[in-house]
């Protein structure tokens, strides 16, 4: 009876409605919903906005009725009691007017004459709320003076901090080689992960949802794009949501290059293992899925694996992928630099010699370990010893520190 065939779905729908009605009844007296009837002006707030509203009511020292909603389904009886008691009510919630619209419906029965305020001129539909925004909305409703939000002087003093990959991150090297080969006119769909931080390298044109890099790349190609298309996603993202997109690209003969940034972990969200690491979430050894074998089985005509720290070989591999007449896959494999250092792996750092000509090519590479001072590059203590900056330096001025 749990298989939703038509004969089962109809009674299951009735069961669901009955469960929701029972939940609604139970929540009328739940501690998460709190009603305090006071003056003829009221506030209905949900979630974190309820805490902001309570603090604002205390500061304004007004006799305001207050309903804090902390659970769904909405407590309709509590809302109706509030509406019957007040002549004006302000609904405070983040983003869309979900609660506000329900309040408007209930008001037709409870109190058709009540004035309902909310998203029109008081609470924004975008962004998150804060205390000053809520406090000023209540003050505006009451006709009282609004307060200016506290200014953070650090915002105007500190330089902007654009998105950036870690020092020594192999994704930076992969993207550098990718851009070197595919150029400015190419399309670069990307995905969800720490590699999204490479947006300033000019190789992240889209970021929609997990696995969308491949499907977007296919769609762009079949939409008539003639320039090169090179998409990118991580190993975890590929195994989670990219395989069907790759199969679809192969099946439909999409001429695109898919770059799988394999750092052997799920770095963006806490370094969890994935099926390609050979380890479960509890640390047990398990089957290690081969991304190369998967890519070939799903129909990719060209599959190559590179170490992005080896810049020349990586560029050559991307060149072959660009020229390939069908679906090509480049697997850029190098362990996450944070995970590698935690496991005890150490490389010799690099330094800049007097041969530096100040061309700033290494600075444009975007590594946080590279600074520029007195017309010369300088490598700071963040250096992990990946050596990619040395590989791209035209004057061979970056060299490994001798120990």
Go through each PLM region and give its residues.
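Flexible, low-complexity linker and terminal segments
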Residues: 1-165, 170-171, 308, 316, ...
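Short hydrophobic segments within beta-strands
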Residues: 44-46, 189, 232, 259
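Structural motif
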Residues: 41-42, 88, 187, 228-230
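Short helix-loop-beta junction
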Residues: 55-66, 184-185, 293-299
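Residue-level detector of anion-binding/catalytic polar loops
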Residues: 65, 187, 255, 301, ...
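Active-site diphosphate/adenylate-binding microenvironment
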Residues: 148-214, 223-226
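Short glycine-enriched loops at secondary-structure junctions
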Residues: 47-49, 191-194, 262-265
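Thiamine diphosphate
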Residues: 197-331, 341-343
């Amino acid at each position: 009876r749990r298989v939703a065939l038509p004969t089962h779905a109809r009674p299951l729908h009735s069961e669901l409605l009955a469960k929701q009605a029972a939940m609604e009844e139970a929540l009328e007296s739940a501690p998460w919903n709190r009603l305090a009837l006071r003056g003829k002006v009221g506030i209905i707030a949900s979630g974190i906005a309820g805490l902001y509203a309570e603090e604002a009511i205390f500061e304004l020292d007004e006799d305001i009725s207050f309903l804090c909603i902390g659970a769904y389904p909405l407590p309709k009886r509590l809302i109706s009691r509030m509406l019957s008691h007040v002549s004006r009510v302000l609904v405070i919630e983040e983003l869309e007017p979900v609660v506000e619209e329900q309040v408007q419906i209930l008001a037709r029965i409870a109190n058709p004459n009540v004035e309902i305020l909310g998203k029109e001129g008081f609470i924004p539909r975008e962004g998150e709320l804060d205390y000053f925004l809520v406090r000023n909305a209540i003050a505006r409703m009451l006709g009282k003076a609004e307060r200016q939000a506290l200014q953070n002087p650090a915002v105007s003093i500190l330089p902007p901090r654009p998105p950036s990959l870690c020092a020594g991150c192999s994704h930076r090297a992969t993207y550098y080689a990718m851009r070197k080969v595919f150029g400015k006119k190419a399309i670069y769909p990307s995905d969800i992960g720490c590699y999204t931080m490479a947006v300033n390298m000019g190789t992240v044109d889209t970021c929609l949802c997990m696995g969308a890099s491949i499907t977007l790349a296919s769609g762009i190609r079949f939409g008539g794009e003639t320039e090169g298309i090179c998409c990118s996603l991580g190993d975890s993202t590929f195994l989670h949501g990219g395989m069907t997109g790759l199969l679809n690209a192969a099946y439909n003969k999409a001429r695109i290059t898919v770059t799988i940034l394999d750092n052997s972990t799920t770095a963006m969200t806490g370094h969890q293992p994935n099926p390609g690491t050979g380890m479960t979430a509890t640390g047990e050894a398990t089957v290690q899925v081969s991304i190369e074998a998967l890519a070939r089985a799903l129909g990719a005509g060209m599959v190559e694996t590179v170490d992005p720290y080896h810049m020349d070989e990586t560029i050559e591999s991307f060149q072959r992928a660009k020229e390939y007449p069908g679906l090509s896959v480049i697997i850029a494999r190098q362990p996450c630099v944070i995970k590698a250092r935690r496991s005890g792996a150490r490389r010799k750092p690099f330094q800049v010699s007097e041969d530096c000509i100040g061309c700033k090519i290494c600075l444009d590479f975007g590594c946080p370990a590279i600074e520029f001072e007195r017309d010369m590059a300088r490598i700071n203590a963040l250096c992990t010893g990946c050596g990619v900056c040395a590989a791209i330096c035209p004057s061979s001025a970056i060299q490994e520190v001798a120990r």
